[in-house]
């Protein structure tokens, strides 16, 4: 028996709503998603919300699998913005915004190699090498979170009640981000528009149904 588990299997669900993307791109996305599950007896599709089973596709929709450290963390509403840059090139956008808003504290994680664990630009802007424990600690104490819209960290932010700015860089992330917005995660932008994130942090209300759904993972999987 082979069971496959991933968020992208939701793209094969007939009720999944896609953003207005190029039709050919969506066909390709679904094709490659199917290819990853050839021979699977069951596809567990990680989702922001409860959805029906699809026996014809062998799809069972399940909650996101969050790390134990996230589930055990007590969030507080801090005064800094937290972020994760999949591509360290985005750091220039962060620096430019910081010059205009020098008094907003920023703790940004990146994948940049050959730099110190913390690159402290000044007392309000720090770039951190990715470190799971530190990342969760900063997430728990942040005002809000900015990311390139990977599924896992968006779920972590939602669980901890943090509004999210998502900047997708490819079609899979665009679909994730669109779905996350429907689930109340936050907003999507084509750049790291931290003004939008600050504004969102003033009005955002966490989605209690999401936390309840996450807590069902143990007995649904």
Task: Give, region by region, the residue ranges found by the protein language model.
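Nucleotide-sugar donor-binding patch of glycosyltransferase catalytic domains
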Residues: 119-120, 163-206
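Donor-nucleotide binding loops and adjacent catalytic segments primarily
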Residues: 63-141
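Leloir-type glycosyltransferase catalytic cores
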Residues: 35-42, 49-52, 185-221
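Short loop/helix-cap segments at secondary-structure boundaries that form the rim of catalytic
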Residues: 1, 37, 50-59, 72-76, ...
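A donor-sugar binding/catalytic signature common to diverse glycosyltransferases
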Residues: 1-4, 137-176
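Short, acidic/turn-prone active-site loops that include or flank metal/cofactor-
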Residues: 7-11, 110-113, 131-133, 169-173, ...
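Active-site-proximal region of nucleotide-activated glycan assembly enzymes
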Residues: 2-61
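Short, charged, surface-exposed secondary-structure boundary motifs
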Residues: 12-20, 70-73, 116-121, 139-140, ...
